[in-house]
Regions:
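Double-stranded RNA-binding/processing signature
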Residues: 1-184
């Protein structure tokens, strides 16, 4: 349901885009972090029923659980209200603000391109970690010369770097840096 609706949306909105670009764009929409972001925007995590142990160990903030809940909600809407209602929900809550979602999904790559255009390199530094082994939270900073120094947090080092890269792009955009991902 989600992939079908996303594919149709991308194709009808970009009929001249090549297949590879369409595939990458769809992947950026239906990936776990993006779906978790969509779920958080509608506060879905507040309504997920979890076991006590899962709730106590941070399950309510875990991307995998939140994104799965969004997919389950879409399935429930489809079963209860039919294809048209599920499609409307996907358009309203998943396919909205695609530029921002694509920026989040590709943030490390896009940031690297932007920073290299300024003759610099992005450095990621692990500044801390907290929590038990099964529910670690990593903190990193990303910096590039005097362009930016920003923080990111995630349940993996990679996720923390991705969040820091996204924050750096938002910072650069806010300060007027023009950029567009290559091949998008």
């Amino acid at each position: 349901m989600l992939e079908l609706t996303s594919s149709e949306f991308i194709y009808t909105g970009n009929p001249d885009m090549n297949e590879g670009k369409m595939t990458r764009l769809r992947a950026s929409i239906v990936c776990e972090p993006t779906l978790a972001m969509c779920a958080r925007q509608i506060h879905l995590q507040e309504y997920i029923m979890l076991g006590k142990g899962e709730d106590l160990t941070g399950g309510r903030t875990r991307d995998s659980i939140i994104s799965d809940a969004l997919e389950a909600l879409i399935g429930a809407i489809y079963l209860d209200g039919g294809f048209a209602n599920a499609k409307e929900f996907i358009h309203r809550f998943v396919l909205n603000d695609l530029e921002n979602k694509q920026l989040f999904y590709d943030s490390k790559t896009i940031l690297q391109e932007v920073v290299q255009a300024h003759g610099l390199e992005v450095e990621y530094e692990l500044t801390g970690e907290e929590g038990p082994e099964h529910d670690k939270k990593f903190h990193v900073i990303a910096k590039a010369g005097n362009l930016f120094v920003v923080k990111g947090t995630g349940h993996t080092k990679k996720a923390a770097q991705q969040q820091a890269a996204y924050n750096a792009l938002l910072h650069l955009k806010k300060n007027g840096t023009q950029f567009m991902p290559k091949g998008k």
